[in-house]
Each structure stands twice: as structure tokens, then as C-alpha cells.
A protein has these predicted regions:
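Periplasmic-side early beta-strands and strand-to-turn transitions of outer-membrane beta-barrels
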Residues: 178-303, 554, 650
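Short, acidic, small-residue-rich periplasmic hinge/interaction motif at the N-terminus
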Residues: 25-65, 106, 114
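Outer membrane beta-barrel strand-and-loop segments of large Gram-negative receptors
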Residues: 368-377, 421-425, 431, 519-523, ...
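C-terminal beta-signal and adjacent terminal beta-strands/loops
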Residues: 119-122, 553, 647-656, 682-742
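A beta-strand signature from Gram-negative outer-membrane beta-barrel systems
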Residues: 133-185
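Surface-exposed extracellular loop regions of Gram-negative outer-membrane beta-barrel proteins
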Residues: 284, 456-458, 475-530, 547-573, ...
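Gram-negative outer-membrane beta-barrel transporters
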Residues: 185, 439-445, 547-552, 568-658, ...
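Extracytoplasmic beta-strand/coil segments of soluble accessory domains associated
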Residues: 73-121
């Protein structure tokens, strides 16, 4: 099968390129095609007229010409300021990389679908180092069902509230219409190397009128990615001795994904509509052998290739959108999201944390309810203005039958039972916000905003922001912003019944055993986000540079000092706030209209600093710089070619281990700069059928996982740290996509 996919992809590429090159002297692409190509890095505003420097858009056409395999994060990562990384610098679950915006980590990236938050990853427990065994929340919508993706960075994201300190990814789906439309799409790839998992995906959509004022949309999806071979990293692992001598760091796990979603729209009055939507998704992993500490036991070996965790997600929402002749618009919605995280039993103590201790499944049930209402009012008082007022209420409730079960093996914690602790936790957030877009002159837009959040556990937070867009001469625009962003602690971090135990290895400053306990006295994380950008636009040319700095306060981590010691000498640590951290960098953009049919788009991100001011250690392990370049050629109306190039800079590991000691030996390993080249071709065979074939990583620049970042072990054996070498990068991969629609 893989050879057939390679052959088909190669034939599509050769055939289209063969047609293309003889036509190079006669470029006949339409203006519409040109504008579509130029949308690659169009900077938009977050639901308003403000043109912020930290907003980028990925269009449906770009997704069609560069279809992602596992997850749309593969294409989101090509936006300025975006990378993929783990929840922490530990390297644990190193191949479960998620979207990191401006070095603030995945926990500070808010994922939205059609403007509504997605929270299923919150049903996965936090490990001692802050990791979650999760695939993130960017795979709930099939790529072919996406109209566009907005990536919002910096101060512009603060209006979205909790969890948006790094930025926001808003996945916007294709809508209903007055005419019947349908599609069937399929995607398959074939890695050059047999030890890498392949992907197959198929999905459909159907939309149209139901009669009267009603219309509907329905889509469904099936996809499967095989797990990497259990020994994919053999020969590349860091040194392992004793009982760990025969263990290997795992590759990327596979996944089986099923989605179905239905929406009915009722236009019950002029400029007024109600939408009723329901969706069901099921994601099951195909286990590749990973454990939190890259160790093994008989259950690890037995479960390779099987499902060991299943995430079920049910969503129900009602949305009322309205407008009036005077320009006033309203948006009101209610959403109920019900993720159920079902997984095999895992250890919660020391070296056995995250490794299977049972083949029995236990459930973690998360219930998330959100109510949202906002109104936008245009008016003319001194200057043209557009005032937005809104409110939100969010409740999260969790029943965790899996993670609150660690016995107090190291002795008592006053007030808490060794067994039978409550599996329940919950929190509510009530929010009010106001934003005013003020057109001071034809070239000056000022946007002040204020958001208030009250969290039932951590209390009040105020998030003011101010953004300015100032035209300079005909072609230059100065863009500036400052905002106070906010993130509430998770239900695990605030739950005193969530307790982890270590006999000493996991303890920061203790030689003997220690506990880590949830802390209901935490403060919310905040960040003062600032950016200044200068942009030039003329005749299709776009050039810009943006400086950003996030002064991060009260980041939540496992504690550095014990708060109590019991009569057995066991220290008690809690989740605590780190006083200060800072992230700073530069983003650059250059788009060149080479000709009427050739467009060259580029962006670069350069990180100046990312550190915990208390310890000086790094906040996340991301490249020093990332360059993304795309060359698109619309050969003729029905044929387009594309090359993509990404260059990742050096990646440096943590400076200190989990005990606060400077890293040594292989713990200091860096990832050297490397680059990835991709080629693709798209042919619109008919009005209703298109083919895309391509190859990722043309020069087969592979990267292997060597282990976790830090050394662990004891008298019976040692697993030496791998520094920054904690993930796999796939080699050369051929792919073919068929899209049909009517």
C-alpha cells in the first residue's frame, strides 16, 4: 500500500510539474487566484477593525494545497511566533508536542472552534513536572472542514480571557448556505521509513436548505495514524545502565479518530439567526511504548499498538447572532462540553509515575459549561467608535476516579486520608469585558479595553489593554499594544486531594521522600504583554517587523521548598507561584509578489530570552529562531505548485535539573539547527475534483528522541538525560489528497 501511495503522489507531482514548466512563459492565472495566494500571511483583527501585528490567517486553500497529516498544528506552527513543544522543559511525553505561541507554552495557548473554547485536554492530569499525556485540542475538526484558522498573538489575545496569555488559535469551520453543497475527501501518506507511522483520512460534508428559513450542515470524519515502531529510536538513546539498559525512548504514538458534527440554522427574522449544533468525537491512541520516565515493564511491552487511552468529547451549543439596521450587532451563545478521559491505570509515585499498573480503564469526567453574550454598538461621538460590551460565565466540574488515588505511603498529611479522598473538584469564572475601537483620524485607530474575571478559588483579576494602529505616510503603519493577560490555575493544581509521591528522586531539595499536593491558595498567572510593530504594504509587497516582550508573573510550578515535614521525615511540597519570568523576541514578515502568478511569503521568529527570573532557567525548549518560507506558483487556472521551507535554529536544554543543580553530561545535549523542505502540486481536474500530491522533508532530515531531559535512576540503574533531544522529526514522507465537491 505504501508503495502505491508513493507512486500516486509521485505521478501527480511529475504530471503537474510536467504540465507546468512548458507553460512558464504563459502565466494565465486569474486575479482571484492571485488574491488567494496573497492571503498566506494576511494580518486580520480579532473580531474588530483593529489591524494588530500579532494576527495571522491560514485559509482553506492553503490547507488544501498543504494538507496536514496528523493534526492542523503542523500548519499552524508555520505562523510567526508559533512552535511545537511540550508542556514543560522536562522532555517527558516528549513527542506529545502542542502549540506554543511566543514561548509561553501550550498551557497558555487558548484553542477555539468557531470562537468557543475547547477544554478536553484539561481532563488529563498534570504530572510532577507539569506535563500532560495529551495530544492537545487541535484535532477535533477535520482539516478539510476548516474555512480558516486565525492565530492571534500578544496583546490582541488578552480580550479572550483565561488561558490566552500566549495567544489564541481560532479554528473556523465551513458554514451552511442557501444552496446544496457536499464534499468527500481522502488523504493518505507513505513514510519513506517503515518504522514511522502512516496516516489515512477520509471525511464527508453535506449542507443546504431544509425549507423555509432553515438550513443545515453535517460532516463526519475517520482517520487513523499508525504508531511508530517500538524501536524507532534504537541506537540514538542516551546511555542507560542496570535495569534500564534494555529500555528505549518511545516514538510517536498513533491515533484513531472519529468525528461527527451537525448544525441546524434558523433565520427566524431579518438579520437574526439561531444555530443549534451537536458533535461527538472519539480519539483512541495506538500505544508506542511511551511512559512518563521512559522506563518499561511487562504491561508496557504487552500494550504496544493497542489503545491505552480514549478521549470521548460531546459538545452541544446554541448560538444567537443578530444585527440591526443601525449597525448594532449581538453574539450570544451557550456551550456544554463533556470530555471523558478513559485510560488504563497509571502509577502516581516517583519513577513509576505514568507507567501502567493495570489493564483496567478508569474514567476522568470533565463537564464544561460556558455562557457568552456580547453586543457591538457603533456610534459617532467626537470620533467614529465601535463599543463592544460583553459577559461570560464558565463552570468546570471534574470527577476523577484515576488520579486522586495515591496512598500516603510516606506518612500522614494532616487533614487528608490515605485512601478514599473525594474525586470531585470544580471552579467557576464570571467575566465582564468592554472594548472600544476609536477611529481618531483616517489613519489612527485606538482600542482601549478592560476585562474583569472573578474565579471562585483564586479571586479577582483585572486585564486592561491598549492597542494603537497609526498610519505613517502612504505605505507604512506603526502598530503598538500592551495588555495584562490572565490564566487561572487548573483543577489539578488547586485540588488538595490530588497528591503525588516520590521516594526522593522527584523532590527538589529533599533527600528522602516527598509529596506534591494541590494548593487552593494559588494566585492566577498573569503576563504584561507588549509589542511594537512597523509594517510596509504596497502593490502586493508586505514587510514587517515586530518586537514583543511578555513579563510573566506567578507562573505555577511544583514547589521549590517544602511547606511541612511529617514524623517520618517526608516533606510536603505544593504547587506554587514563581514570582517573575520573561519572554522576549522578534517577528519578521516579508511577502514578495514575484510576478502575477508567483508569490513568495516568509516569516521569521527570533527568541531574545525566555527565562525564570528566580532561577535563570528556560521556560520552554524552542528553537532560537524559526524561518518559514513558501513559494507558490499559480501555473494556470487549474494547476498550482508550492514549495515550503522551514529552518529551525539551535535548541538548548534546561540549565538546571529537578533538584536545582546545574545539568551535566548528556543533560546538556543541544539540538543543532536543521531544515525541512517540502514540495506539493495541486491540480483541479474538473470543477468538482482536485488532486494534491507532495513530499514532506525532501532531503530526509530525521531527528530522533534520546530520552527525557533529566537523568533519573538509583542504585539499580540509571537513565541519563537527553537535554533537548526529546522528540522525533519524521523523515521523507509522500502524500496524496483527493478532494471532491459539488
Amino acid at each position: 500500500m505504501n508503495n502505491r501511495i508513493k507512486s500516486l503522489a509521485l505521478l501527480v507531482n511529475l504530471g503537474i510539474y510536467g504540465v507546468a514548466f512548458p507553460l512558464s512563459a504563459a502565466e494565465t492565472a486569474t486575479d482571484d487566484k492571485n488574491s488567494a495566494a496573497e492571503e498566506t500571511m494576511v494580518v486580520t483583527a480579532a473580531e474588530q477593525n483593529l489591524q494588530a501585528p500579532g494576527v495571522s490567517t491560514i485559509t482553506a486553500d492553503e490547507i488544501r494545497k498543504r494538507p496536514p497529516a496528523r493534526d492542523v498544528s503542523e500548519i499552524i506552527r508555520t505562523m510567526p511566533g508559533v512552535n511545537l513543544t511540550g508542556n514543560s522543559t522536562s522532555g517527558q511525553r516528549g513527542n506529545n508536542r502542542q502549540i506554543d505561541i511566543r514561548g509561553m507554552g501550550p498551557e497558555n495557548t487558548l484553542i477555539l472552534i468557531d470562537g468557543k473554547p475547547v477544554t478536553s485536554r484539561n481532563s488529563v492530569r498534570l504530572g510532577w513536572r507539569g506535563e500532560r499525556d495529551t495530544r492537545g485540542d487541535t484535532s477535533w475538526v477535520p482539516p478539510e472542514m476548516i474555512e480558516r484558522i486565525e492565530v492571534i498573538r500578544g496583546p490582541a489575545a488578552a480580550r479572550y480571557g483565561n488561558g490566552a496569555a500566549g495567544g489564541v488559535v481560532n479554528i473556523i469551520t465551513k458554514k451552511t448556505g442557501d444552496e446544496w453543497h457536499g464534499s468527500w475527501n481522502t488523504y493518505m501518506n507513505a513514510p519513506e521509513h517503515k518504522d514511522e507511522g502512516s496516516t489515512k483520512r477520509t471525511n464527508f460534508s453535506l449542507s443546504g436548505p431544509l425549507g423555509g428559513d432553515f438550513s443545515f450542515r453535517l460532516f463526519g470524519n475517520l482517520d487513523k495514524t499508525q504508531a511508530d515502531a517500538w524501536d524507532i529510536n534504537q541506537g540514538h538513546q542516551s546511555e542507560r545502565t542496570g535495569i534500564y539498559a534494555d529500555t528505549l525512548p518511545a516514538g510517536r504514538e498513533g491515533v484513531k479518530n472519529k468525528n461527527i458534527d451537525g448544525l441546524v440554522r434558523w433565520e427566524f427574522a431579518p438579520m437574526q439567526s439561531l444555530e443549534f449544533e451537536a458533535g461527538y468525537s472519539r480519539q483512541g491512541n495506538l500505544y508506542a511504548g511511551d511512559t512518563q520516565n521512559t522506563n518499561t515493564n511487562d504491561l508496557v511491552k504487552e500494550n504496544y499498538g493497542k489503545e491505552t487511552n480514549r478521549l470521548y468529547r460531546n459538545t452541544y451549543s446554541v448560538t444567537w447572532n443578530g444585527a440591526r439596521d443601525n449597525g448594532v450587532t449581538t453574539s450570544n451563545w451557550a456551550q456544554y462540553e463533556r470530555p471523558r478521559n478513559s485510560r488504563k491505570g497509571e502509577g502516581l509515585a516517583g519513577g513509576t509515575e505514568g507507567i501502567f499498573n493495570s489493564n483496567q480503564f478508569s474514567d476522568i469526567d470533565l463537564s464544561d459549561v460556558m455562557l457568552h453574550s456580547e453586543v457591538s454598538i457603533p456610534f459617532d461621538y467626537l470620533v467614529n467608535q465601535n463599543l463592544t460590551l460583553g459577559s461570560e460565565w464558565n463552570q468546570q466540574r471534574m470527577k476523577d476516579n484515576a488520579s486522586n488515588t495515591q496512598a500516603l505511603s510516606g506518612g500522614e498529611i494532616p487533614g487528608y486520608d490515605s485512601t478514599g479522598r473525594s474525586p470531585y473538584s470544580q471552579a467557576e469564572i464570571f467575566s465582564l469585558f468592554a472594548e472600544n475601537n476609536m477611529e481618531l483620524t483616517d489613519t489612527t485607530m485606538l482600542t482601549p479595553a478592560l476585562r474583569f474575571d472573578h474565579h471562585s478559588i483564586v479571586g479577582n483579576n483585572w486585564s486592561p489593554s491598549l492597542n494603537l494602529s497609526q498610519g505613517l505616510w502612504d505605505d507604512f503603519t506603526l502598530k503598538m499594544g500592551i495588555a495584562r493577560a490572565y490564566k487561572a490555575p487548573s483543577l489539578y493544581q488547586t485540588n488538595p486531594n490530588y497528591i503525588l509521591y516520590s521516594k526522593g528522586q522527584g523532590c527538589y531539595a529533599s533527600k528522602d521522600g516527598c509529596y506534591l499536593q494541590g494548593n487552593d491558595d494559588l494566585k492566577a498567572e498573569t503576563s504584561i504583554n507588549k509589542e511594537i510593530g512597523l509594517e510596509f504594504k504596497r502593490d502586493g509587497w508586505l514587510a514587517g517587523v515586530t518586537w514583543f516582550r511578555n513579563d510573566y508573573r506567578n507562573k505555577i510550578e511544583a514547589g521549590y521548598a517544602p511547606v511541612y515535614q511529617n514524623n517520618k521525615g517526608t516533606d510536603l511540597y505544593q504547587w506554587e507561584n514563581v514570582p517573575k519570568a520573561v519572554v522576549e523576541g522578534l517577528e519578521g514578515t516579508l511577502n514578495v509578489p514575484v510576478s502575477e502568478t508567483v508569490n513568495w511569503t516568509n516569516n521569521i521568529t527570533y527568541m531574545l530570552q525566555s527565562k525564570n527570573k528566580k532561577t535563570g532557567d528556560r521556560l520552554s525548549i524552542i528553537p532560537e529562531y524559526t524561518l518559514n518560507s513558501t513559494l507558490s506558483w499559480q501555473v494556470r487556472d487549474d494547476v498550482s505548485l508550492q514549495s515550503t521551507f522551514t529552518w529551525y535554529g539551535k535548541q538548548e536544554p534546561k540549565k538546571y535539573n529537578y533538584k536545582g543543580q546545574p545539568v551535566t553530561g548528556s543533560e546538556k545535549n543541544e539540538v543543532s539547527p536543521y531544515s525541512i523542505l517540502g514540495l506539493s502540486a495541486t491540480w483541479d481536474v474538473t470543477k468538482y475534483v482536485s488532486l494534491t500530491g507532495g513530499v514532506d522533508n525532501v532531503f530526509d532530515k530525521r531527528h530522533w528522541r534520546a530520552g527525557n531531559a533529566q537523568t533519573t535512576g538509583g542504585a539499580t540503574g540509571t537513565m541519563y538525560g537527553a537535554g533537548a533531544e526529546t522528540y522525533n522529526e519524521s523523515g521523507r514522507t509522500w502524500y496524496l489528497s483527493v478532494n471532491t465537491h459539488f
